[in-house]
């Protein structure tokens, strides 16, 4: 008797759940174009502008360091590097459009840096940053290595740049 009741309830539940009068599910009632435009204007564009500004300031500091090769200009360059890297962290997720086409995120922040490739590129004086093999020899980790990892002391790092212009050119 229990089996028959259980079977009857199971069949009844199946029939009720298979109702053909289903409602058509409609999409959201808001305009996605307006949402995306708003996202671009108030989120993406300001962050990209900030990133470009920070990169430009880092480039100015880098050029200043290449000329002066002193402790003060190295510290300014390091400060601008940190600012630019922080700005990069805010735009890295925006991998759309031209950035996606040129694999910008693969060129900007590949970790770990390939120190052997960086050293080979600097020694040869010729390198192609469009070559995918150089992705781990460019970008922020490479700049980090060149500003902090060439030696233990700032004086020795400055000496490396003073003795070999290829290092300054690569930076």
What does each model-identified segment do?
Residues 1-2, 116:
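Short, intrinsically disordered low-complexity segments
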Residues 2-9:
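Sec-dependent signal peptide recognition
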Residues 14-17:
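C-terminal motif of bacterial Sec signal peptides marking the signal peptidase cleavage site
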Residues 19-22:
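Bacterial signal peptide processing site
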Residues 24-171:
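Mature extracytoplasmic or organellar-lumen-exposed domains after removal of signal/transit peptides
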């Amino acid at each position: 008797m229990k089996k028959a009741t259980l079977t009857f309830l199971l069949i009844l539940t199946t029939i009720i759940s298979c109702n053909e009068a289903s409602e058509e599910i409609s999409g959201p009632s808001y305009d996605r174009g307006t949402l995306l435009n708003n996202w671009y204007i108030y989120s993406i564009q300001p962050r990209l502008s900030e990133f470009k500004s920070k990169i430009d300031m880092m480039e100015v500091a880098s050029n200043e360091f290449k000329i002066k090769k002193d402790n003060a200009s190295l510290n300014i360059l390091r400060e601008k590097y940190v600012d630019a890297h922080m700005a990069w962290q805010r735009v890295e997720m925006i991998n759309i459009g031209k950035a996606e086409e040129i694999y910008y995120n693969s060129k900007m922040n590949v970790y770990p840096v390939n120190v052997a490739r960086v050293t080979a590129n600097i020694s040869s004086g010729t390198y192609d940053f469009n070559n995918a093999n150089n992705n781990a020899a460019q970008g922020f980790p490479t700049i980090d290595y060149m500003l902090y990892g060439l030696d233990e002391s700032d004086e020795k790092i400055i000496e490396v740049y003073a003795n070999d212009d290829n290092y300054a050119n690569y930076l």
